[in-house]
Amino acid sequence: MYKGILLLLSAEFCFTLSTVFGKFAMADEGMTGIEVSFFRFFLGAIAAAAYMLWKRVSFRPNNITYVALRGVSNTAAVLLFFTGVQHSTVTNANMLNLTYPVFVFLLAPFINRERSRGRYFIFLLLALAGVYLIILPDFSSVNPGDLCALLSGLVAGFAICFLREARKFDSSEVILFYLMLPGCLINLMVMAPGFSIPSGTGLAYSLCSGAIAVAGQALLTVGYRYIEAARGSIVSGSRILFAGIMGVSIFSDPLTLQIVLGGALILVSLVGVSGIARKFFPPNGM
């Protein structure tokens, strides 16, 4: 289990660091979030294809519907997330994106036909309270970037539910490849009118952001082999801490009491919906 925890912590550190390099490309070189995310999908598609060729894994999916839904929904989530990073802060974007397990809990009964416990609505309310504190830290205005980051969490909830269904028919390698390939194509279509290949530091930052995110995805995939999903979702919440530290120390992100409380409430909701709480507080007592 400790190996799984270490791998997942490393994965979440990579995902946060990826957003830092992406923010550098946006702030210093004027790139958009969509342009930065293209390199993540591009490098990921190359890495996934190379691995499948090396392992001689067939590129033909068994259930194209769920594989495609997973790929398209994940692409939309990533585009929204990096748009959030562009217009908001690294801290806020990561915190709001991490609401996705709560949306999985809401969507699972409809997509996966899994029952959701009624008591989990308490954790939903906690998450919504946390979102409110982050999006409205001064209780006056809403940052469009924060809304994009929150929407990325909602769409990621759909993506996770589709992933659960896709795994019933296809391997992780096939799902990952068809996650990255649509991302490349959709990104190209969205940014084609005015896109030009960046040069210098813009290209370096984008490549670093993409490569580190791909490394994080690999660590995440391997890590879940050594830890159960419920515990893993709690470890994934460490990205809130990483984002807060990096955002404040590197970009001087504002970290008000309201934002800290909002992040804490979201983290508590992650603990709740993961099912960990049931192990320590069973409904029928000890």
Protein language model regions, located:
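Glycine-/small-residue-enriched transmembrane alpha-helix faces in small-molecule transporters
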Residues: 1-35, 140-165, 285-286
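Loop-to-transmembrane-helix transition segments
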Residues: 4-11, 56-80, 143-154, 191, ...
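Transmembrane alpha-helices of multi-pass small-molecule transport proteins
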Residues: 29-76, 155-159, 178-193
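Alpha-helical transmembrane segments of compact multi-pass small-molecule transporters, enriched
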Residues: 43-47, 96-110, 125-126, 182-186, ...
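Hydrophobic transmembrane alpha-helices of multi-pass small-molecule transport proteins
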Residues: 48, 119-136, 156, 258-277
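C-terminal transmembrane-helix exit sites in multi-pass transporters
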Residues: 52, 56, 81-83, 100-122, ...
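Helix-helix packing/entry segments at the starts of transmembrane helices
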Residues: 93-99, 166-182, 217-249
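C-terminal-most transmembrane helix of multi-pass membrane proteins
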Residues: 237-286
